[in-house]
Amino acid sequence: MKEIPTPRELSELEIKDVINEFRLAARSAIEAGADGVEIHGANGYLIQQFLSENSNHRQDAYGGTIEGRSRFAIEVAKAVVDEIGAERTGIRFSPQGTLQGIDEGENSLEMYRYLISELNKLTLAYLHLMHFGNEQFLKDVRQLWDQSLLVNRPGRSLDQLSSDVDNNLADVVTVGTWVLANPDFVERIQSGAPLNEPDKNTLYAAGKEGYTDYPFLK
């Protein structure tokens, strides 16, 4: 078995380099023809690691307090906005999500209220939330955020997909796994056709299985 090194704390200079890499990646996406980019601050990846108490043990300006743990996400967003424009930039979070062993701590929703308020000042194109059921928090975000709000509720049944839009809790509802399993998802929904069931065993596997082999309607 290959030995996995223990992660170490980035220096502040290295943090600046990583922020610059986000900026360069955004520029590259636009030059390649993308309409915009979504900054991935969810699912246990680097931005959420800065936000989370059990992975961010820093004692400098990027750790400790709510403001400190939020700083990296805000600086990444500012760098991307400066490079490609706010109208081309969205950001995604998964408040209280625990993927990859993440634990954001007891004050996580207070932290997100602060973070979202600060990001709102940048007038990003949208905020994309994975929502895990704290309805008051979602209502609070709706008040804090002035631009488009996208909401994904993992595991929500198809007949409930539109409820957040219907109840003015979101502008857009996003779908993940169902779309992976149904390359013609929109057509199936419009026509009432049955959906392919996602194969969870292949979601993170290599090869075409679960990637390009789901059947079309015709």
What does each of the following model-derived ranges do?
Residues 1-218:
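Flavin-dependent oxidoreductase catalytic cores
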